[in-house]
Each structure stands twice: as C-alpha cells, then as structure tokens.
C-alpha cells in the first residue's frame, strides 16, 4: 500500500485500523496498548500462522508462495468482532460507551484502598450474580442490563472496592466465579499461584521471562543456557 515505505511503529499501524481509537477513557486521548496489538498480535502471530499455512500448502501442492503479513491487516482482523458490532448498531464511536471498553460497570477496573486495582469481567448473568453476592450488594437494586442504573452501580462498586486493599479483595474473591482478578505488575505476575503452578515464567541467568506458548505434549519446552552452543550445533538441532 501507499504507506509500505513510510516510517511507523505499532501505535501508527493500529491508529488507521480503528483499534487505537476504541481504547482509552472517554474524553481523553486513546491509550496505547503497549505494542501488543500491531507488532505482536497483528504482525508476529499472523506471520507465524501464515508461514505454517504456506508450508502445509507447499507440502500438498509442491509450490511455495509469498506470505504478505502486514501489521495493519492483522490488527484490522483482530477488530473483526467490533466491526460486526458497529455495523449491527451495537457499537458506539464514543469510548466507554460499549460492552467491552469499560462502558459497563461489570467490565472495568476498580481502585482499591491501597491504590491497587481489581479487574471485573462479570459479563454473564451467573457471574454477575456471584459478583454482587461477594460484594454484599442486593441484586434487586441493580438489574445487570438496566442502563438507567449503571451510574449508581458504578458508584456502589467504587465504594465497595475502595474499602479494602487489592490483596484483601483478591483473597475474598479467590475460588469464586465472579470473574474478578487482581491487576498485577510485571514484577508481581510471576509469583501468582496460577502462574507458578503452570510454570508460566522461568528465571534464566537472573532474568525472569515467560516460557514458550503454546505447549506441546510431545516436545515440551525446556530452558538451556546455551552458553556452549555454537552455530553448527544450533543448526544441527533444527535438522
């Protein structure tokens, strides 16, 4: 396309797909989602999938092909559901006015007494019911999809979550199906019990890093410091 030779970064790529414009708080500039959407989600993942698909095709047809994996294309594909919502009249251009952009009281983050945050994602009725039960809020006061009550619902949730620390709330919701989780920092995430149990992170040479994903039953990933591995040895492992 006309921008193929122009300088740019993740933020620029997703800006022209509608993705960036949908993220952030109402009345404020869009919030950069790190560089996850364009570089990795829209670029690397689609390129990897494209390479695998092209290899499978070559094995079947005997012919190779060029894989054109543009980050703008990939980011646009990631927005497919939201374009469908928009065309069906179910998505507004204004941020924090929709189901999944913080526009609903039961799908957003709330600040806790210690300045931490809890993520609430109780979209389905059964999970919303558990959320209200754990917050000790009468379900009759706040029917889930009564938009006229959402403003008061937000206030009630804010007041509740502000009454305890993040870790206290995490312990309170542990084991429940309220779809509530503590918002952890990069430094904190490796120590979360779920991540520890799954060995989601591993330390190598004093550096904490995520383990490879997805996982394969026949060829599980392992960590090797690679200090004695030369080029020839590395290439031999790929044969």
Give the location of each predicted region.
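Aromatic-enriched alpha-helical interface/lid elements that frame and gate functional surfaces
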Residues: 101, 106-176, 180
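Short, glycine-/Ser/Thr-/acidic-enriched flexible segments
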Residues: 124-125, 188, 221
């Amino acid at each position: 396309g006309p921008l193929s030779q122009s300088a740019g970064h993740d933020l620029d790529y997703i800006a022209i797909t509608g993705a960036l414009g949908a993220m952030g708080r109402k009345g404020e500039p869009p919030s950069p989602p790190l560089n996850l959407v364009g570089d990795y989600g829209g670029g690397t993942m689609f390129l990897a999938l494209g390479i695998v698909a092209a290899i499978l095709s070559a094995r079947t047809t005997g012919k190779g092909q060029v894989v054109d994996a543009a980050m703008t294309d990939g980011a646009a594909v990631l927005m497919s559901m939201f374009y469908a919502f928009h065309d069906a009249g179910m998505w507004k251009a204004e941020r924090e006015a929709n189901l999944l952009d913080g526009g609903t009281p039961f799908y957003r983050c709330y600040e806790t007494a210690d300045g931490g945050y809890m993520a609430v994602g109780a979209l389905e009725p059964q999970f919303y019911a558990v959320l209200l039960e754990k917050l000790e809020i009468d379900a009759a006061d706040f029917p889930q999809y009564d938009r006229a009550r959402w403003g008061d619902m937000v206030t009630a949730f804010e007041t509740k979550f502000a009454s305890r620390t993040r870790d206290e709330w995490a312990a309170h919701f542990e084991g429940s199906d309220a779809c509530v989780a503590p918002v952890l920092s990069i430094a904190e995430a490796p120590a979360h019990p779920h991540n520890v149990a799954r060995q989601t992170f591993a330390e190598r040479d004093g550096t904490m890093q995520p383990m490879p994903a997805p996982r394969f039953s026949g060829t599980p990933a392992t960590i090797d410091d690679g200090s004695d591995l030369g080029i020839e040895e590395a290439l031999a492992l790929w044969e």
